[in-house]
Structure formats: structure tokens, C-alpha cells
Amino acid sequence: MQCALYDAGRCRSCQWITQSVNEQLSAKTADLHRLLAGLPVEQWCAPIGGPEQHFRNKAKMVVSGSVEKPLFGMLHRDGTPVDLCGCPLYPASFAPVFSALKPFIARAGLTPYNVARKRGELKYLLLTESQFDGGMMLRFVLRSETKLTQLRAALPWLRAQLPQLRVITANIQPVHMAIMEGETEIYLTDQQALVERFNDVPLWIRPQSFFQTNPTVASRLYATARDWVGQLPVRHMWDLFCGVGGFGLHCATPQMQLTGIEIAPEAIACAKQSAAELGLTRLHFQALDSTQFAIAQGETPDLVLVNPPRRGIGKPLCDYLAQMAPRFIIYSSCNAQTMAQDIRHLPNYRIQRVQLFDMFPHTAHYEVLALLRRSI
């Protein structure tokens, strides 16, 4: 992939950009083999790749510069701003949004936050697009509610310029730290969620719910999990760290009993909405801590699917799963190192199959899906 920002030495986020996609995939596959060394794997499935550019459905932009000439992108450690509007990871549909937002910021009087001086209001712009219908969600991350009245007054102009903006919010992040969002979310539109659709499964995206940033590869990840579960004798399943329910909603059947657990209430609201649309009455989603939920249960499902953050599921949950001994475990991970550590804490399980998904091209990161079967 050619990138003018990289060539000019202004951005180094895509550290592997000089390697071909095939070289990157080979290196990631070798890394996964290294991490799983000593753990018998019955079947290595072929790795799954995707587009090398224009694949991201989300932009996270630091806002700097002045109210008359705002700049969207990132700040180097020395405070130097870099404009990332031309980043080739973003789809072409983002460019007109960035172009319209620059004069809008002046109209609304949203002074960019100055980190060194601790002054200003607008810290970040967070833009998300639905691949399904092109609808977009825009979040203004502000230091306070001081400019809310001006922001509301200027919105009709912005919405006339960009009718694809379906969900607009103001997120309040008052802390002087590099934290992307705060707890308070103020909706500025009637619509509060974007609809996405993977493999004919409706998925909803709300402001504070996690959603994969590479929809092409994510849809294949979910479809693969559905295929694997469909080949197993599963009548009762847990989906832990379930997010908006992508895995559970793909794997569930009308006859299956499924419980999805996620600590973020916004994500659970999305999952419940999708389950209702699909008419799946035996799916139950709850906003709880996944480890605490599992340890408190007295029943054993046929299969437990886990999709934890980068830190993995941790030894307490591993120990409980080993004790509870479901017949199958599916582990989806964005950090194969912690996944390998966790699997080593499950000595009575064997890896039946594993597959790599190149969710993050031009970086060392990747997603991996592993099916574990109880051996005794």
C-alpha cells in the first residue's frame, strides 16, 4: 500500500507497510506457530486476509490547530500535529465528512483543545460508518458542556451538508489525559444507533459499544465461528465478553439456549435489539462481568465462547473453566500471546483447529480463532 504520510515520515502507525500483504501474512502465521509451540494443534486452517486499504470503518481524530483552521489527526510526543485526513486506511466516504467538519467547527465555535495550555473544548472527533447502508455516527468529544448550545444551534447546517450522519453525540471528557472518551454521552439526534449487517445478521453500533474496525474480515470471523459451532452437538452455549453479540447472534439457532455476557450496558442493549429482530427468544444478554458471571453459575454449558480484550481471560476464569469442564471452548483473541498463556492453563483441552484473521493489515497485530475440545 502506498501512503504519502508514511513516505514523508509523518506517520509510522503502519509499521509493516513496506512489506507485501503476503509477507505480512506469512510473518503473522509464523508468530502464531511460535506462540502455540508445544500445544498440539489438530488442524491449521488457512489464514484469512482482506483489503489492504480503505477497510477501516472508524476514524479517531485528535483535533488541534485553531477554531478557524482545525487539524484532524494525531499529536506526536513533542506535541507536533499531523493531519491524517488522507490516511489510506479510511474509505473514500470519510473525505467529504472531514471537509465539511472544518468550517463547521468555526460555525459552532468549538475551539480545539490545546494540551500544553489546558485550554479549549473540542478534543476528538470519532467517526464510524456502517458498511451496510452508509450511515454514519459522529461523536464530538468535548472538555465540558460549555459549547453544547452553540453546537446544537449549528447542527442543522452540518446535517444539510452531510445527510449520512444518522447519529450525532457530544461526549464529555473533562480529564486532562489522553483518554478518548468520558462517561457522559449526550445524544444530539433522535437516532441513537447505527445498523450494520454481517452475513444477514443485524448488528447495532452505539457510541460506547465496541465494534470491530475491519468489517470485511470481521464478517468472515463471525461466519467461521458459526460454521464451527454448527458442526458440534451444542444445545447450550455461553458467549463471554460478547460485545454487541456478534458471535452469539451468528452461532445461535432457534433451539439453542445462549447466554451472552458483557460488562458494557450499551453493547448489551445492541445485542438485545438484534436478538429481538431475529426472533431468537432463547438468547439472553446481560451486562455483567464475564468472570464473575461464570464463577457464580451452577450449570455447565456445552460450549463456552470467549472473546476477551488484549489481556486475555486470565487465570481465575481459566481455572474455573477447567473445573467446570464444558465439552468445547472457542477462543477468539486479538492477542495470541495471552491466548496461548490462557490455553496452557487449560491442561485438559486440546486445540482441534485454529485460524488466523488479518484484521489489522500493515501492523504486527492479528485476530485468531481457536476451537478447544475437552480431552478427558
Swiss-Prot record:
Its EC number is 2.1.1.189. One of its GO terms (molecular function) is 4 iron, 4 sulfur cluster binding. Keywords: 4Fe-4S, Iron, Iron-sulfur, Metal-binding, Methyltransferase, rRNA processing, S-adenosyl-L-methionine, Transferase. GO terms for biological process: rRNA base methylation. S-adenosyl-L-methionine binds at Q212, F241, E262, N307. The active site is at C334 (nucleophile). The keyword Iron applies. [4Fe-4S] cluster binds at C3, C11, C14, C87. It catalyses: uridine(747) in 23S rRNA + S-adenosyl-L-methionine = 5-methyluridine(747) in 23S rRNA + S-adenosyl-L-homocysteine + H(+). It comes from the Bacteria. Pfam families: tRNA_U5-meth_tr. It is an enzyme of class 2 (transferase). Catalyzes the formation of 5-methyl-uridine at position 747 (m5U747) in 23S rRNA. Belongs to the class I-like SAM-binding methyltransferase superfamily. RNA M5U methyltransferase family. RlmC subfamily. This is 23S rRNA (uracil(747)-C(5))-methyltransferase RlmC. The gene is rlmC.
